[in-house]
Curated annotation (Swiss-Prot):
Binds 2 manganese ions per subunit. Its cofactor is Mn(2+). The gene is gpmI. Keywords: Glycolysis, Isomerase, Manganese, Metal-binding. It is an enzyme of class 5 (isomerase). Its EC number is 5.4.2.12. This is 2,3-bisphosphoglycerate-independent phosphoglycerate mutase.
Length: 510
């Protein structure tokens, strides 16, 4: 039976910007995109900041974008979720955090706060540490000690002095808390099983092994004098009257305030793993500690979790599956996890009726050397699929504008967009021939801004809106759309009722 498929087509990193200088999207020859823009309802979508569950003004990215697209609702990212919880008072009542506070009161013991000391917002945020100090004081926790991991990667390489000063000001304003140890993230936040690094951080925290300093600021300055920037500061101990300020002991509580899991797992395991064999934890290994992690680092870690993952019900894949509709996810390697795992709300398995095609990305050093990447091969496979009437719904990603855009090179990025346009035409014209329709848009900006105002290469994502085209005659698109509105639009085109969990709205005006 002939199918009239509805497709979501993501031109990854294809933003909308009026200025044409350094704008690969504007400078590319793209007759197909321009033809659809001229002949079909079109507009723009917001794809950054609060509109995708990130802090205001923060650029979007592919993971966040595809999660929002698939969910059909704004999905708050960990940083924003925690910020919101602090603002609205939920943080102060958080069960896991309060369990840590209670543990110290019942055991007449100390609370220790571990985490990356910066406002980089990638692994942690210093504001969350300050909120923990304020909350612990309000809840009557007697002693709190901070084990500060210095950044220098997500922020400037020598910026820790300002963060230490911010922390010391908070401690002084509250007249509460003290810094106990300081360590570069290279040691405390290793993720590559370099256990000798983790061991140094662990032994500083538990056994006060390492160089001793009266003042964290002096410690960092000594490290700089030794050519070691923030990231590489060797774990060291802060002393008062010649004695270590604090170590983690039996019956204490720990809150690890990093929200990104990958670099917090190993140190957490060093404290909680009963079957430990990576290094000798020594006689001081603390027993009966209450260990709390800000988010779920790994289900195998014996810890309470302050902000559990949000389980997403009725993402686009599940809704299509429940309706008995067949669906295809197709992309090349670079964006395959995005059209599958992220689009499915962090789920690896296919839904019933969901099929997947993975086309290998070319094996080149950098994609500016092959700007077309695998766009032709992806399209060949998809055209074959559409001709054979295989699927009711299609989710396709063209990786080129983003992956080549990251090179910061204008000419290859223009070529990348031209290759995508040629293949976009092959796909969309065939869908239209079959009586179907497509939603053509991007997940975030990048290739529309290839140079800085000073004329230097620009390699990052942007906060600009993205274009959207719905290839259906006789409808009008409303303004004010965002990525969360794409899945409801697809359901609208398929004649499927939107589930209550999808708070996004169809872009098609009723």
């Amino acid at each position: 039976m002939s199918k009239s498929p509805v497709a979501i087509i993501i031109l990854d990193g294809f933003g909308k910007r009026a200025e044409t200088v350094g704008n690969a999207v504007a400078q590319a020859n793209k007759p197909n995109f321009d033809r659809y823009w001229a002949n079909f309802p079109h507009g723009e979508l917001k794809a950054a900041g609060l509109d995708v569950g990130l802090p205001e003004g923060q650029m979007g990215n592919s993971e966040v974008g595809h999660t929002n697209i698939g969910a059909g609702r704004i999905v708050y990212q960990s940083l924003t979720r925690i910020d919101k919880a602090i603002e609205e008072g939920e943080f102060q009542e958080n069960k896991a955090l309060n369990n840590a506070f209670t543990h110290t009161k019942e055991n007449n013991s100390d609370l220790h706060l571990f985490g990356l000391l910066s406002d980089g917002g990638v692994h942690s945020h210093i504001n969350h540490l300050v909120a923990l100090l304020e909350t612990a004081k309000d809840k009557g926790v007697k002693n709190v000690y901070i084990h500060a991991f210095l950044d220098g990667r997500d922020v400037a390489p020598q910026s820790s002095l300002e963060y230490l000063e911010t922390l010391e000001k908070a401690i002084s304003d509250l007249n509460y808390g003290a810094i106990a140890t300081v360590s570069g993230r290279f040691y405390a936040m290793d993720r590559d099983k370099r256990w000798e690094r983790v061991e140094k951080a662990y032994k500083a925290i538990v056994s006060a092994e390492g160089e001793k300093f009266e003042d964290p600021i002096e410690l960092v300055k000594a490290s700089y004098a030794n050519d070691k920037n923030d990231e590489f500061v060797v774990p060291a101990i802060i002393t008062k009257d010649g004695k270590p300020v604090a170590t983690v002991k039996d019956n204490d509580a720990v809150i690890f305030f990093n929200f990104r899991p990958d670099r917090a797992i190993q140190l957490s395991n060093a404290f909680t793993d009963k079957e430990w064999d990576h290094f000798d934890r020594g006689a001081n290994h603390p027993k009966n500690i209450k260990f709390v992690t800000m988010t779920l680092y790994n289900p195998s870690i014996d810890a309470e979790v302050a902000f559990e993952p949000i389980e997403m019900k009725n993402v686009i894949g599940e809704v299509l599956s429940n309706e008995g509709l067949s669906q295809l996810r197709i992309a090349e390697t670079e964006k395959y996890p995005h059209v599958t795992f992220f689009m499915n709300g962090g789920r690896n398995e296919e839904f019933p009726g969901e099929n997947r095609i993975l086309i290998n990305s070319p094996k080149v050093e950098t994609y500016d050397l092959k700007p077309e990447m695998s766009a032709y091969e992806v399209t060949d496979a998809l055209v074959e699929d559409i001709k054979n009437d295989k699927h009711d719904a299609i989710i396709l990603n063209f990786a080129n504008p983003d992956m080549v855009g990251h090179s910061g090179m204008l000419e290859p990025t223009i070529k990348a967009i031209e290759a995508v346009d040629e293949n976009l035409g092959r796909v969309v014209d065939l869908i239209l021939e079959k009586g179907g329709s497509a939603i053509i848009f991007a997940d975030h900006g990048n290739s529309e801004t290839m140079s800085t105002p000073e004329g230097k290469p620009h390699t990052a994502h942007t906060t600009v809106p993205v274009p959207v085209i719905v290839t259906k005659k006789g409808v009008t698109l409303r303004e004010g759309g965002r990525l969360a509105d794409v899945a409801p639009t697809m359901l609208d085109l398929l004649g499927v009722k939107k589930p209550a969990e999808m708070t996004g709205e169809s872009l098609i005006q009723k």
